[in-house]
From Swiss-Prot:
Catalytic activity, reaction form: uridine(2552) in 23S rRNA + S-adenosyl-L-methionine = 2'-O-methyluridine(2552) in 23S rRNA + S-adenosyl-L-homocysteine + H(+)
The protein's role, per its UniProt record: Specifically methylates the uridine in position 2552 of 23S rRNA at the 2'-O position of the ribose in the fully assembled 50S ribosomal subunit.
Subcellular location: Cytoplasm
Keyword Amino-acid biosynthesis: no
The protein's name in its UniProt record: Ribosomal RNA large subunit methyltransferase E
Active site, per annotation: 173 (proton acceptor)
One Gene Ontology term of the molecular function aspect: rRNA (uridine-2'-O-)-methyltransferase activity
Gene Ontology CC terms, in alphabetical order: cytoplasm
Sites where the protein binds S-adenosyl-L-methionine: 60, 62, 92, 108, 133
Gene name per UniProt: rlmE
Organism from which the protein derives: Burkholderia multivorans (strain ATCC 17616 / 249)
EC number, UniProt record: 2.1.1.166
Amino acid sequence: MAKNRFNQHWLHDHINDPYVKMAQREGYRARAAYKLKEIDEQDKLIRPGQVIVDLGAAPGSWSQYARNKLAQGKKRDAVREGGIDGTIVALDMLPMEPIADVHFIQGDFREDEVLHQLEAVLEGRTVDLVISDMAPNLSGVASADAARIEHVCDLALEFAQNHLKPDGALLVKCFHGSGYSQIVEKFKQQFKVVAPRKPKASRDKSSETFILGRHLKHPR
């Protein structure tokens, strides 16, 4: 009975969420697009000509936002013809519906086969921006969840270290709680500039936050 009440309450909040309504109106697959939008507007992350990699991209709202932003950077005639000023690669183990001008690779980005596909798209270019809205399945057990969250962030950090330009940036989703300070410390070891971000589109009740790292300390 309690679970049913929780589901009904969540559904009511979801239906009446202004960001959900806005996403439906503007064609985004999820309200998460507005989290990236707010952070991008604050930190000027996405710029014409960039190479962007979206980790854990499905269902694709972050890639949609990045695509729309890079489309704005095209000259007027080029926009009519389609295309974007830049490259976006979306990676996920789950399937994802196609997005115009976005290269989607399905698979685990730790595996060689997936990395070879990524390298084929990049054609020797390094990455300007890595974005990750990945989150593990949470159990409700604080210690176990902290380890899972840290592991996901570690994966994004390792990917960024291997693929980012020296002046590149990494944006990842994280959660406040046990283990958060350790994740921030890892960012500080890897990046010269580290900043937490809590966009308004993140629900007030959620411990969700984002960590932005810029300028690698030890580029490869």
